[in-house]
Amino acid sequence: MSGRGKGGKGLGKGGAKRHRKVLRDNIQGITKPAIRRLARRGGVKRISGLIYEETRTVLKNFLENVIRDSVTYTEHARRKTVTAMDVVYALKRQGRTLYGFGG
């Protein structure tokens, strides 16, 4: 291993570069019925038509913030895999403590 730490990462033959599909407009995958079901769970009876796009925007911003913080924790620990604890710590940092996932 010659002093490279855990996992022996470092020099070596680089593997083939994989093509990754560019993700676009996936927020539309949060469908109108899915938003309606979430609202029903929250006790909402009637929903304005303008709510759906606004909900998608708010959800996207929330997830971007949580994922950014989670990845920061992962990079700081020099890992490549985001763990449940990274997400728990990211949520706690934003004042939304989540119980039931360790820690």
From Swiss-Prot:
Coiled coil: none annotated. Residues 1-14 have a biased composition (Gly residues). Keywords: Chromosome, DNA-binding, Nucleosome core, Nucleus. GO terms for molecular function: DNA binding; protein heterodimerization activity; structural constituent of chromatin. One of its GO terms (cellular component) is nucleus. Pfam families: CENP-T_C. Transmembrane segments: none annotated. InterPro entries: CENP-T/H4_C, Histone-fold, Histone_H4, Histone_H4_CS. SMART domains: H4 (SM00417). SUPFAM superfamilies: Histone-fold. Residues 17-21 bind DNA. It comes from the Eukaryota. Residues 1-20 are annotated as: Disordered. The keyword Protein transport does not apply. It is found in: Nucleus; Chromosome. Belongs to the histone H4 family. The nucleosome is a histone octamer containing two molecules each of H2A, H2B, H3 and H4 assembled in one H3-H4 heterotetramer and two H2A-H2B heterodimers. The octamer wraps approximately 147 bp of DNA. Core component of nucleosome. Nucleosomes wrap and compact DNA into chromatin, limiting DNA accessibility to the cellular machineries which require DNA as a template. Histones thereby play a central role in transcription regulation, DNA repair, DNA replication and chromosomal stability. DNA accessibility is regulated via a complex set of post-translational modifications of histones, also called histone code, and nucleosome remodeling. This is Histone H4. It comes from Volvox carteri. The gene is H4-I.
